[in-house]
UniProtKB/Swiss-Prot annotation:
PROSITE patterns: PTR2_1 (PS01022)
Gene behind the chain: NPF5.14
Membrane topology category: Multi-pass membrane protein
Species in which this protein is naturally found: Arabidopsis thaliana
Modified residues annotated as Phosphothreonine in this record: T103
Protein name stated in the entry: Protein NRT1/ PTR FAMILY 5.14
Key words of the record: Membrane, Phosphoprotein, Transmembrane, Transmembrane helix, Transport
InterPro entries: MFS_trans_sf, NRT1/PTR, POT_fam, PTR2_symporter_CS
Length: 557
């Protein structure tokens, strides 16, 4: 029976966290929003730095570095894909060896070093066109070395900072659990604001003033973010397991697979129970239950796994089908930086007399949509939904993800209709064979698809972050957030593969390719309809899988 003094201690201290001295973390002076705001500020600076170099990277490659458009696009896609997939490795290092806090410090230093070298490479490019081949080779090596150093720094920074921020809220406390759900909303709003600022300010400086200055500003922001992060160390909550347990979580869970596979070959008569608790979760798969057993001729407990380890292994396996279905969102999501922008190039971009908006700048409307809708979702939608569903977060994370997939399907339908309208405009005015001509159709026609994609992000991307964070074992939460990032990376690669196959099947520029270089003869509308179908099929698959999904219990996390 729990005594009054024990209850008082539970209310005063966080069970699974310690402070910077390794002592039990007090609720009153560690964690929660006070600590989370420091960490959110760090992420805003990091996203500002990342998009400060990434959003206009193709212009630098085709400009100062003199690459062709095709080579530059390939280099951008390769860097973007690797930068999105590397966080899985960074999260592994954090969860298995270093812990989140130390991984953030080390990766931030690598990040700053990469940005510093990137600034140096831009500064060394001569203003004249007389560049020797040896100088050109050196500058290219320095630039790409710097660029991939940034990707390595981002790989440890991206998943760990968000996981560390969410760690500041105790999910065993009902109020803090609700605050943690809000944290994911405000986290995404804040980083979107940082991205918007980078697109509007840094890109302008790079184009109008200096590339070295344009790369230097993100470097300064990353230095500031590192100082900010370290300054808050006294109020952070740190994982208790990282301080007290020596067993690598991957070793524990890997052992479950090994023992279960080994025992699978034995008959039931050769096995005896070792540790099968009376309250074992019914959702455990029979395959993993074999890890709780030991051969009769073995010493007591020699090969048995703990029940908690089996639950952790089962939780990871259950995530795989959900991860695959989120690709139905990731593939359409990859289009906004490519074909949405290409559509805008052909349209009337005049916003004021004598003032034209760059097509890529329309991406800012995704951020604007997020910034506007997150407060509405968090302060209006969630309280109303909570009254109806009785869920602390309004709706479950899977329902939130599914809603976003539906919105992305609608986005592709709208994009297809707008593209059909654009092609009809080209036909009506006899501009089909004049790809350089500006069509008498305002670029503002593209705004709805950007705004709707931002709205879909609020549901699906934020939902994915919260879902994968909460459904993995406590020690592997950096891996959980890396899973969400990896889905976007794989979706981008699948999109590239799909485009290549369709282009090959439809004859390329010499035939009637959907992606003809002359966009007025292309059929992006067909492609958008295809993506709408893929997204719709993915949604129904997601619906089927999510209905049978059993959420991981929180009481033992």
């Amino acid at each position: 029976m729990t005594t009054t003094s024990e209850i008082s201690l539970q209310e005063e201290y966080v069970t699974d966290a310690v402070d910077h001295r390794g002592l039990a973390a007090r609720r009153s002076n560690t964690g929660r929003w006070r600590a989370a705001l420091f960490i959110i500020g760090v992420e805003v600076a990091e996203r500002f730095a990342y998009y400060g170099i990434g959003s206009n990277l193709i212009s630098y490659l085709t400009g100062p570095l003199g690459e062709s458009t095709a080579v530059a696009a390939a280099n951008v896609n390769a860097w973007s894909g690797i930068a999105t997939l590397l966080p899985v490795l960074g999260a592994f290092v954090a969860d298995a060896f270093l812990g989140r806090y130390r991984t953030i410090i080390i990766s931030s230093l690598i990040y700053v070093l990469g940005l510093a070298f990137l600034t140096l490479s831009a500064f060394l490019i001569p203003n004249t066109t007389e560049v020797t081949s040896s100088t050109s080779s050196f500058l290219n090596v320095l630039f790409f070395f710097s660029l991939y150093l940034v990707a390595i720094g981002q790989s440890g920074h991206k998943p760990c900072v968000q996981a560390f921020g969410a760690d500041q809220f105790d999910e065993k406390d009902s109020q803090e659990k609700s605050d943690r759900s809000s944290f994911f909303n405000w986290w995404y709003l804040s980083l979107s604001a940082g991205i918007c600022f980078a697109i509007l300010v840094v890109v302008y400086i790079q184009e109008e003033f200096s590339w070295a200055f344009g790369f230097g500003i993100p470097c300064v922001f990353m230095v500031i973010s590192l100082v900010l992060f370290v300054s808050g160390r006294r109020i952070y909550r740190y994982s208790k397991r990282r301080h007290e347990e020596e067993i690598n979580p991957f070793t524990r869970i890997g052992r479950v697979f090994f023992v279960a596979l080994k025992n699978q070959r034995l008959s039931s008569s050769d096995l005896c129970k070792v540790e099968l608790e009376a309250n074992t979760s019914p959702e455990k798969q029979s395959f993993f239950n074999k890890a709780l057993l030991v051969p009769n001729d073995s010493s007591q407990g020699e090969n048995a796994s703990k029940s908690s380890d089996v639950e952790d292994a089962t939780a990871l396996i259950r995530l795989i089908p959900v991860w695959f279905t989120t690709l139905a969102y990731a593939i359409p999501y990859a289009q906004y930086m490519t074909f949405f922008t290409k559509q805008g190039v052909t349209m009337d971009r005049t916003i004021l007399p004598g003032v034209k908006i760059p097509p890529a700048s329309l991406q800012v409307f995704i951020g604007i949509s997020i910034v506007l809708f997150v407060p509405i979702y968090d302060r209006v939608f969630v309280p109303i939904a909570r009254l109806i569903t009785k869920e602390p977060c309004g709706i479950t994370t899977l329902k939130r993800i599914g809603t976003g997939i539906v919105l992305s399907t609608i986005t592709m339908v709208i994009a297809a209709l707008v593209e059909f309208k654009r092609l009809e405009t080209a036909k009506e005015h006899g501009l089909i064979d004049q790809p350089e001509a500006t069509l008498p159709m305002s670029i503002w026609w593209l705004i709805p698809q950007y705004l709707l994609l931002g709205l879909a992000d609020v549901y699906t991307l934020v939902g994915m972050q919260e879902f994968f964070y909460s459904q993995v074992p406590t020690e592997l939460r950096s891996i959980g957030l890396a899973l969400y990032l990896s889905a976007l990376g794989v979706g981008s690669l699948l999109s590239s593969l799909l485009i290549s196959l369709i282009d090959l099947a439809t004859g390329g520029d010499a035939g009637n390719s959907w992606f003809n270089s002359n966009l007025n003869r292309a059929h992006l509308d067909y492609f958008y309809w295809l993506l709408a179908i893929v997204s719709a099929v993915g949604f129904f698959t997601f619906l089927f899988i999510s209905k049978s999904y059993i959420y991981r219990r929180v009481d033992r996390v």
